[in-house]
Amino acid sequence: MTPIIIFGAAVRPDNSPSPALRRRVEAAARFGAGLPDALYLPTGGKGRHGEAESTVMAALLRELGAAPDRIREEPTGTDTLSSVRACRALLRDLGHQGPVFAATSRYHLPRCLLLLRIAGLAARPVPIGPSRADRWTLRWYWRLREVPAIPYDAALMLWHRRG
């Protein structure tokens, strides 16, 4: 099995995926299509609108041709850290010990990979295409937003590993 963890993003009020969520799922589906044993792990709980992010992502994966038995929803993650912890537990329960792949937005990828690695998972990135955030102003906004989040979440993950 080759797990592909898809990190959540906003669901719109009409229950459709936001553009960021759609890009993450499409990148994971493209990547997983080339693997004989892809296991998609969409992670994300219920946000402000609609169903849980994981449920919306699972539906989109099926629309894109992923077999339902290759999708395992993780609907409890409320942020990046809790999603990593929940996916680590799920993979442990499945007996998985190999590499995992992370599908998310470019700005979010360094934090996801770091947290997965601190959690003891051999994490690698899923290639993702360009996004709206490729405009320099948005690109810097999203990058700067990650500056405090990376050390904060890393410290919390290390603390959780101790306990």
Model-derived features: where do they sit?
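A structural signal for short, hydrophobic/glycine-enriched beta-strand patches
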Residues: 1-140
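A transmembrane-helix-recognition feature enriched in membrane-embedded lipid enzymes
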Residues: 136-163
